[in-house]
Amino acid sequence: CDFCMINIINRTNSAAHISSADSNKFRYWDPNFIIGQFDAIAKLGIKNVKIADELFVLNPRHFEKICDLIIERGYDFNIWAYSRVDTCQPQYLDKLKRAGVNWLGLGIENPNTVLRQEIHKDSFQEVRIVDVLRQMSDAGIAVGGNYIFGLPMDTEASMKETLQFAMENLTEMSNMYSAMAYPGSPLYLAAKKGGLELPDRYSGYSQHSYWTKNLASRNLTSEQILRFRDEAWMTYHTNPKYLALLESKYGLAAMNNVKSSTTIKLKRKSLGDKPPSGGNS
């Protein structure tokens, strides 16, 4: 994706014009090696596992073998993993669930087909996101939905559509981001070429920092996007239907924990807020 820079760690050319899109090469650890790591943490009594691979559900020959090895051992893990929307096929969900994958972080990003295809320059397959969410729910897998506001072609109307989609298709967890031109990403090179304002410090690339400096779109200022993102997050997490979903699935304590987080308003320099007490953030 144009906003992602994770593959930059694989680059073999350090020239300034090289981005993560030019470095889309990686190698898999063998499943028989990976299961050894699961064996080790199982012996330690660890149950909760987060698989950091952002594209775990991508290559069936890889992730299905890992699931098979976990299932064979009868481990009772509670696993969080990640998937693209278009690779999370229904035929894999039962096996993922039996291996202990109870959560999948899903890159929904934007429900608008045109906007989503603009940032996916690879072989992204078009899918009905609503169907994917329903299939995951039917399989007993909770979803961490990830949304991005302020993509290059975003307008206020399209951002409202994204929020409306999230509100109508509630997931157990929702991350809402402003589009950020991270160094090493194609979006960063495009922003520099276009003369767009970028952060002047690394904390400016943080989504929750006082110094956050997200990217402007072709139609909206950075400030308009950031304000919308912060308000959208609050709207979602104070939605009575969402809170009822949390309470029904995870109990009153979990619901109250989320409610307490909504009492904290992020301070933003670009939106005219005074610095938070206690120093820089």
Report residues per predicted region.
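Catalytic cores of alpha/beta
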Residues: 92-94, 152-168
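Generic recognition of well-ordered alpha-helical segments
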Residues: 132-135, 164-165, 177, 228-231
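Acidic/polar loop patches that form or flank catalytic/metal-binding clefts of enzymes
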Residues: 144, 172-177, 243-244
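Radical SAM [4Fe-4S] cluster-binding motif and immediate context
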Residues: 1-144, 164
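Histidine/acidic-residue-rich catalytic or RNA/ligand-binding cores of hydrolases
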Residues: 63, 159, 188-189
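Radical SAM enzyme core and accessory elements
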Residues: 186-188, 193, 197-281
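Conserved strand-turn element in the central/C-terminal portion of the radical SAM core barrel
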Residues: 84, 109-120, 133-158, 177-183, ...
